[in-house]
Amino acid sequence: MSDPSSSDPFDVVVIGGGPGGYVAAIRAAQLGLKTALIEGRGSLGGTCLNIGCIPSKALLHASEHVAQAHHSFADWGIRLGKISVDLAQMMTKKDEVVEGLTSGIELL
């Protein structure tokens, strides 16, 4: 994708770096069009990837681990002490998941 600060006109300007936007921009560039992608969020992937579905599912996954530690492990004879949740670490891991996926899109 081209540098939007250039004074040369673009053939295609795509607004929004969600799943439709970045795919459209990639395809336009593959077809030889001078393409700009405008994304206000600062990272590609759209709402689902950055603040919606994926972060929510990452936190849900963490909560499932907590539930297993509290309930399912004992069924298998695994006894743990008091289980505690480090919310700050859960949020850090969630951010790492999102960052990994958004950085993967940027490599396209």
Where are these regions (language model features)?
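Glycine-rich flavin
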Residues: 2-4, 9, 27-33, 39-108
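Residue-level marker of alpha-helix boundaries and capping positions
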Residues: 15-16, 96
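Glycine-rich Rossmann-fold phosphate-binding loop(s) that bind the pyrophosphate
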Residues: 16-19, 42
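Short glycine/serine/threonine-rich phosphate/pyrophosphate-binding segments
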Residues: 20-24
